[in-house]
Amino acid sequence: MLMKPLAASTAMLLALAANAQAEELTLCWAAWDPANALVELSKDFEAKSGHTMKFEFVPWPNFADRMLNELNSGGKLCDLMIGDSQWIGGAAENGHYVKLNDFFDANGISMDAFVPATVTGYSEWPKNTPNYWSLPAFGDVVGWTYRKDWFERPEIAAAFKEKYGRDLVAPATFAELKDIAEFFQGREIDGKVVYGASIYTERGSEGITMGVMDVLYSFGFKYDNPDKPYDMQGFVNSPGAVAGLEFYKALYDCCTAPGASNTYMGEGIDAYKSGQVALQMNFAFTWPGFEVDPNVGGGKTGYLVNPAGPNGERFAQLGGQGISVVSYSEKKDAALEYIKWFATPEVQANWWKAGGFSCLRAVVEDPGFASSQPYAQTFLDSMAIVKDFWAEPSYATLLQDTQKRFHDYVVAGNGTAQEALDGLVKDWTTNFEDEGKL
């Protein structure tokens, strides 16, 4: 266990806190299954601390707008915020979150105790510096599910092998994934026409950006020059990045269901559970629900790390969030008690059991973790290859530009991939020039 010893047991500290003024804390997050699990988990905190927890959960398509507006207005609705990874730069630089370094030091909470990618992704600003604004709360990453039961049907497996000359197994490359999607597109299974894949195409929030980036990374896309920050020409619009964007459009055109022009997490879940698609791109948070679903659970679903690109590179889009104390809260001490409780190994182990994706190394590096769920090893392997979108203070503008460029090309069919990425370089350059970074 990498957590530093606490001066006294968590139970004792929380009991002492209960003798102080009991507070009603509001935790803000997205409305999804992990949030419901956290409500149940938090009953332990209420019992031990004497504080009462309230929750404000907002559907994902509206989550960023609603909560960023709350932060930017200095609102006091939220005492605790589980905010998206890309918000960290703006929240830190604009004073929305409480810096947690002193609190961590005083309470024996070491960032070395957490998966490094989640510390960088959820907690640090500036990136790769020991300045912490959140505790890693929910690890998440884009991966794939596939209908393992369909793959194993002898007649389907034989038809695939006859056409492609290889066995129908989980794809190791994106080229293989596209072959499988094309094979299933329009095929009749159990009297129902099915389709190849569900991928992210949503325009209004972040959907198509998360999906396209998940593929582009493995084709060689880079946000900027590793040796010269914000130097994007030839990195964002490299030949590999262009090929990746062309691939994504080809996958959309060949192998998605009719009407899949505005698909994100919820639509992907519905398409997969209803037996509409053979392959589905989605964040790992969906996997516990699939595993217990009567239609696709109980061994019918396989879990897949993002496949490799044409040169063997393999990366995946980071999801997930850290938990922060909102600087405008009048109940910061009680909010910090919650973070202290949440950071303990016992609570983190229970978080995983409840359906949360713990970022604590003592949990995920436990010898029994990989076999604890059918998707656990895929989660570990995926978290080892993550990359993330910009986390700059101007994240929202950068994202809006990206959403438009990608949707216009992939879904609307306007222009070429080269033109879309050249335009994105222009958009992002203007943004960073306005910020004085170029």
Where is each model-derived feature located?
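Extracytoplasmic/periplasmic substrate-recognition and gating elements
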Residues: 23, 48, 126, 130, ...
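Conserved C-terminal helix/tail region of periplasmic/extracytoplasmic solute-binding proteins
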Residues: 24, 47, 52, 381-438
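Extracytoplasmic "Venus flytrap"/periplasmic binding protein-like
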Residues: 24, 40-117, 121, 154-155, ...
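Extracytoplasmic "Venus flytrap"
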Residues: 25-40, 58-61, 140-141, 206, ...
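Mature extracytoplasmic/periplasmic domains
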Residues: 44, 268-269, 285-293, 309, ...
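Hinge/lid segment of periplasmic solute-binding proteins
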Residues: 85-143, 208-211, 300-307, 368-374, ...
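Extracytoplasmic/periplasmic solute-binding protein
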Residues: 124-138, 142, 173-233, 277
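Glycine-centered hinge/linker elements that transmit conformational signals in sensory
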Residues: 176-185, 219-262, 306, 425
